[in-house]
């Protein structure tokens, strides 16, 4: 548990500090476009690096959200309709459901021209995630440990045929209900890019800053601090209480772990619906920086065109849907994007832009030396 607190703290602090650098660079550089800052700092190479990182990061984020729709929505429909046999039912096929949700819900919201209209949907998605966190905390005091549940035992039947004594011991032994305060293994290392991925909001910072009423860098930093603290607290509490509920039996997909223990729990079903609503309403927000990046890269000097706006939006959604349908798991996407594009957007590009564009501070100043070592 301690390593999660340490990793969350460091990643959130570095991410927030890079937001500070980005806002300061935007003021000094005279641009509120991430790609334009890259162009002013390093020419075409900087512009391509910024645009490529933003596109990769946000497509990865969209893919992760649509993966949740793909795997969770069929289970919700199955539970609501009380269906046992799922063979041949198209509305329980995750691929079809992702396409349907993208076409009916996500595409109309994504076609909106201004980001401000999505503030209400973003607020609703945040409330859904708060509800998810509350349920995770409450279930900690409802589910007893050790987990003596028939569904879990049935999952282990094949293994217990060869090692019945050992497996029975693992289910009932009290040691399995004792938290391990510090664990360092390959999974811990793998968590670093995932946490990095989860704290990337930098492509959306400048568009939000541009539309902020009474815009000032200080006000935007206050908004960022509140947002980062809220996300830090939610991530920490969800991880902590999820682990303290299932200990060694916790899975990477927390809702799946609850489903194995509480197959027909109404509250968990409502949580699934809330999570689905949250991720579905978040996708249009993520599309905005991708579309802006592509538009600025391909046709920066042209006036707004609904035809071009719609074509880019449909192309982004179509590509992401293909990715979700044909890639088997989101874990590889999290790891790859977190280690590449997310690291660029948090650690490298804001620091590089700051060093290059903020001229009033000398290169030998404490802040620039610290930034250069950090990047």
Describe the predicted segments one by one.
Residues 1-13, 125-127, 337-342:
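Loop-to-helix transition at the N-terminal end of transmembrane alpha-helices
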Residues 1-2, 113-114, 326-330:
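Transmembrane helix interruption/hinge and helix-loop junction motifs
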Residues 8-42, 57, 66:
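Juxtamembrane transmembrane-helix boundary signature
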Residues 11-15, 55-63, 127-128, 230-234:
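Membrane-embedded alpha-helical segments of transport systems
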Residues 14-18, 129, 342-348:
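Alpha-helical transmembrane segments and their membrane-interface exit regions
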Residues 31-51, 63-98, 122-125, 133-342, ...:
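Membrane-interfacial loop- and helix-cap regions that link adjacent transmembrane helices
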């Amino acid at each position: 548990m301690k390593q999660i607190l340490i990793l969350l703290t460091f990643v959130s602090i570095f991410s927030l500090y890079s937001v500070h650098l980005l806002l300061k660079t935007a003021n000094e550089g005279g641009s509120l476009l991430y790609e334009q800052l890259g162009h002013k700092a390093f020419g075409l190479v900087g512009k391509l690096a910024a645009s490529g990182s933003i596109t990769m990061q946000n497509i990865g984020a969209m893919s992760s959200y649509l993966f949740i729709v793909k795997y969770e929505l069929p289970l919700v429909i199955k539970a609501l309709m009380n269906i046992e046999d799922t063979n041949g039912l198209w509305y329980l096929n995750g691929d079809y459901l992702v396409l349907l949700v993208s076409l009916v819900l996500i595409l109309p919201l994504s076609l909106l021209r201004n980001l401000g209209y999505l503030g209400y949907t973003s607020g609703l998605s945040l409330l859904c995630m708060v509800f998810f966190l509350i349920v995770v905390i409450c279930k900690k005091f409802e589910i007893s440990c050790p987990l003596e549940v028939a569904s879990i035992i049935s999952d282990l039947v094949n293994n217990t045929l060869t090692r019945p004594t050992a497996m029975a011991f693992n289910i009932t032994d009290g040691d399995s209900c004792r938290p391990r305060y510090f664990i360092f293994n390959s999974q811990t290392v793998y968590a670093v890019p995932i946490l990095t991925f989860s704290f990337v909001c930098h492509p959306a910072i400048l568009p939000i800053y541009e539309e902020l009423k009474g815009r000032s860098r200080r006000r935007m930093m206050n908004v960022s601090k509140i947002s980062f603290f809220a996300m830090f607290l939610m991530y920490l509490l969800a991880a902590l209480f999820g682990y303290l509920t299932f200990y060694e039996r916790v899975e990477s997909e927390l809702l799946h772990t609850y489903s194995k223990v509480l197959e027909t729990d109404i509250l968990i079903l409502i949580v699934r619906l809330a999570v689905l609503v949250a991720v579905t309403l978040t996708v249009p927000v993520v599309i905005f920086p991708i579309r802006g990046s592509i538009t600025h890269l391909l046709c920066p000097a042209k006036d707004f065109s609904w035809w071009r706006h719609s074509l880019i939006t449909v192309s982004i959604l179509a590509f992401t849907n293909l990715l979700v349908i044909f890639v088997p798991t989101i874990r590889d996407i999290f790891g790859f994007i977190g280690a590449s594009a997310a690291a660029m957007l948090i650690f490298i590009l804001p620091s590089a832009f700051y060093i290059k564009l903020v001229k009033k501070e000398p290169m030998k100043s404490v802040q620039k030396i610290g930034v250069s070592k950090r990047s």
